[in-house]
């Protein structure tokens, strides 16, 4: 595996100095930036803008112990149960116990949470939770409203420079310690820094069908691994049970939030049978991996493309107010909800694994941090509990920032690096074809139901592509992304092959 993707004389690149460089502008990245000491200079780097990441599309809400009838032990137990025995219990306890305080901070920052007529936070229930503990914004627009508000605040901070339309190429190290990052907007440049936070999100765009936006290719993870960081639980890829099924759908599939089932939605097959009724004690609100597999079994058994989410128990007034985004999307697709059921099927949604970190977001590389979906604190184990993801962004984004504030690191000199560019290049058409090949390979062989022979075949295909991109000159964002995709995909296949038993989202059937 090549150490650096950039080819040429690093010393020829323009340089800027920062105390902290944060790659990624979802909730984890922005929230971390807002918690960096105002005396420290921060670069916040985003591939497109502050609303282009997965955070913006998060519908359900944020899980936290807010209700007087709820308690920490219950939330912890629900999280551990969903994680199927692979959670880091210490990390889970930190997540849960620091949750309410972070919700309080968001309230003070005027994030517009939905409230009841008495002015208290409105709380709903989602799959895997034993009680109502999900706070939300705009009905089903929690990610959008939270990201927008945090982004507005970040743009007013004098110590934060935001790099729009800029992507990460390399994390630089000197003697195993972070000393900068190579990024590229119009042209490549070096951001010198002793501390880098990777908040680059998930790997959804490695799959043909996903709820993630196009930029979610695992590039932060790949850069971290090339810099010497360790990955963990890479086989644990979550597939959301319910995305809107439309034959003409775009690459990013529209999510039908878990909260719809929390408010009474029932999964049915084409004959109207509520097939989850006898499959799990929580029925339609069972953990996501379980619901996903039962939907796939139903589709295979019946030879059909989708099942249906029956929402007829809700009035049109309630549904349109509680789920305005879903209501509008369904109506635009010609589905007369809530009278008519919503056609749904599973799609890739979330990465439980990622860059291994401690409870302060620190990796094994000094000065390199990660938080949010890009990181693996061990919270989610083998299967993430609904609405714990945004909570993780908050709790560990803040923890990473506070650790950096206290560390007082000084800038190291940049290493003297000059990498001769390979003579061979590939055309943009070939890069696009290889991108498609990776996504199809992941969909075929690293999906929700896996076979040993398929995993080996998929790994062989990915390794062939990886060797190809390790030996050519990379001259475009698209080429860098495909190279990173091969690194991340290889990690998924290797981890899936290494884990012989089925657990949580990693489900193996014999050939």
Where do the protein language model's features map onto the residues?
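An anion/pyrophosphate-binding glycine-rich loop and adjacent beta-alpha core
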Residues: 223, 229-340, 403-410
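Glycine-rich loop(s) and the adjacent beta-strand/alpha-helix scaffold that form part
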Residues: 195-250, 254, 301, 388-396
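N-terminal Rossmann-like FAD-binding beta1-loop-alpha1 element of flavoenzymes
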Residues: 20-44
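Glycine- and aromatic-enriched mobile tails/lids
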Residues: 1-11, 15-19, 27, 35, ...
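Short beta-strand to alpha-helix junction loop
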Residues: 87-100, 134-152, 163, 211-218, ...
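Glycine-rich active-site loop/strand segments that organize a redox cofactor
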Residues: 64-95
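Core beta-strand elements of the Rossmann-like FAD/NAD(P) dinucleotide-binding domain
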Residues: 16-18, 186-195, 364-365
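Conserved redox-cofactor binding core of oxidoreductases
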Residues: 108-187, 199, 243-247
């Amino acid at each position: 595996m090549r150490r650096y993707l950039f080819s040429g004389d690093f010393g020829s690149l323009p340089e800027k100095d920062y105390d902290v460089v944060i790659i990624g502008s979802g909730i984890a990245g922005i929230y971390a930036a807002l918690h960096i000491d105002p005396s420290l200079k921060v670069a916040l780097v985003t591939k497109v803008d502050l609303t282009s990441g997965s955070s913006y599309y998060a519908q359900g809400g944020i899980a936290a112990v807010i209700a007087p009838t709820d308690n920490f032990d219950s939330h912890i137990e629900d999280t551990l149960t969903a994680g199927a025995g692979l959670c880091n219990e210490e990390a889970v306890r930190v997540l849960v116990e620091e949750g309410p305080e972070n919700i309080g901070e968001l309230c003070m920052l005027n994030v517009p949470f939905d409230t009841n007529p008495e002015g208290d936070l409105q709380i709903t229930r989602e799959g895997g939770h034993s009680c109502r503990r999900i706070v939300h914004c705009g009905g089903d627009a929690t990610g959008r409203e939270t990201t927008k508000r945090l982004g507005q605040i970040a743009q007013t901070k004098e110590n934060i420079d935001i790099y729009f339309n800029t992507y990460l190429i390399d994390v630089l190290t000197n003697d195993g310690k972070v000393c900068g990052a190579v990024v590229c907007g119009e042209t490549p440049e070096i951001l010198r820094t002793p501390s880098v936070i990777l908040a680059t999100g998930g790997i959804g765009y490695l799959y043909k069908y996903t709820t993630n936006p196009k930029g979610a290719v695992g590039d932060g993870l790949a850069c971290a691994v090339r810099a010497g960081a360790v990955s963990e639980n890479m086989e644990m890829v979550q597939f959301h049970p319910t995305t809107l099924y439309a034959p003409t759908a775009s690459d990013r599939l529209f999510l039908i939030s878990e909260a719809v089932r929390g408010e009474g939605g029932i999964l049915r097959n084409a004959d109207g049978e509520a097939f989850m009724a006898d499959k799990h004690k929580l029925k339609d609100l069972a953990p996501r991996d379980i619901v996903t597999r039962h939907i796939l079994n139903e589709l295979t058994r019946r030879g059909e493309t989708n099942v249906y989410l029956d929402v007829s128990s809700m009035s049109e007034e309630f549904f349109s107010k509680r789920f305005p985004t879903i209501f509008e999307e369904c109506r635009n697709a010609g589905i007369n909800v809530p009278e008519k059921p919503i056609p749904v099927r599973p799609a890739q949604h979330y990465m439980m694994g990622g860059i291994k970190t401690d409870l302060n977001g620190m990796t094994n590389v000094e000065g390199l941090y990660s938080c949010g979906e890009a990181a693996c604190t061990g919270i989610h184990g083998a299967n993430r509990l609904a609405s714990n993801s945004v909570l993780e962004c908050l709790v560990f984004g803040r923890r990473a920032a506070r650790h950096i504030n206290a560390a007082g690191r000084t800038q190291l000199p940049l290493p003297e690096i000059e990498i001769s560019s390979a003579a061979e290049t590939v055309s943009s058409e070939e890069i696009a074809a290889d991108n498609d090949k990776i996504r199809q390979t992941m969909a075929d062989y690293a999906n929700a139901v896996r076979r040993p022979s398929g995993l080996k075949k998929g790994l062989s295909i990915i390794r062939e592509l990886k060797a190809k991109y390790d030996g050519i000159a990379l001259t475009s964002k698209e080429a860098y992304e495909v190279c990173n995709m091969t690194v991340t995909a290889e990690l998924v296949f290797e981890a899936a092959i290494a884990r012989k038993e089925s657990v949580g989202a990693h489900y193996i059937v014999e050939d």
